[in-house]
Amino acid sequence: MEDFVRQCFNPMIVELAEKAMKEYGEDLKIETNKFAAICTHLEICFMYSDFHFINEQGESIVVELDDPNALLKHRFEIIEGRDRTMAWTVVNSICNTTGAEKPKFLPDLYDYKENRFIEIGVTRREVHIYYLEKANKIKSENTHIHIFSFTGEEMATKADYTLDDESRARIKTRLFTIRQEMANRGLWDSFVSPKEAKKQLKKDLKSQELCAGLPTKVSRRTSPALRILEPMWMDSNRTAALRASFLKCPKK
């Protein structure tokens, strides 16, 4: 599973996931399923934010081409992917600026258009079950919940899905691709079932075979959202090398 994750996800997402696990004292060599889950969640949070802006009229727009004359504000503030201290600093700043109620738990995003924090969930189970678990934990009407599954289902607070259909379809397609690639390599069952995960771990420890070539469909581009996070965790040389025009994504 670890080899699959390193080949399936953008290296910067992998590095952020490694840092998150280290912060909580978790061993990615052992908790390989959690490693995969964290990478998946990070990518979906960044995809949720990508290309969404607020124009001068306060309208939400999707922009995929760089227009230097456009005065745009990022619609979403990304909280997920930051270390806890920085994340809470961002949350406190948002609350002080907007008057939003401070959440009890760290959310994933803040939506400047709807003026609300957002909790993103990615589940291998039924979406309604995971939604209820999230809602019972958060216990706040001020945090919007949006759950995605690997089967294309989704559920959101008051059926308000925030994003346009195309943006959500992009997320669902990516999740379905991850599921298919795991299944092709015999990893999906262990990703879903704890019992199967233990069997897979024993198998992985015995044989450290590299994951066979992934499909060319898997994007290796740098998410615009990741570019925002770069300065907080990348050294200056790597940051300089990757710093490009915000909305110009390299294509293969």
From Swiss-Prot:
Secretion signal, residue range per the UniProt entry: none
Site residues by UniProt (Important for efficient shutoff activity and nuclear localization): K195, K198, K199
Domain-related comment: The probable endonuclease active site in the N-terminus and the basic amino acid cluster in the C-terminus are important for the shutoff activity. The C-terminus acts as a nuclear localization signal. The C-terminus is recruited to host protein complexes involved in nuclear Pol II RNA processing.
Family indicated by similarity: Belongs to the influenza viruses PA-X family.
Keyword Ribonucleoprotein carried by entry: no
Keywords from the named record: Decay of host mRNAs by virus, Eukaryotic host gene expression shutoff by virus, Host cytoplasm, Host gene expression shutoff by virus, Host mRNA suppression by virus, Host nucleus, Host-virus interaction
Annotated positions for site Important for efficient shutoff activity: L28, L65, K202, K203, K206
Gene Ontology BP term (one): viral translational frameshifting
Active site: E80, D108
Cellular location(s): Host cytoplasm; Host nucleus
Name of the featured protein: Protein PA-X
Top-rank taxon: Viruses
GO molecular function terms noted in the UniProt entry: RNA binding
UniProt cross-references to InterPro entries, sorted A to Z: PA/PA-X (IPR001009), PA/PA-X_sf (IPR038372)
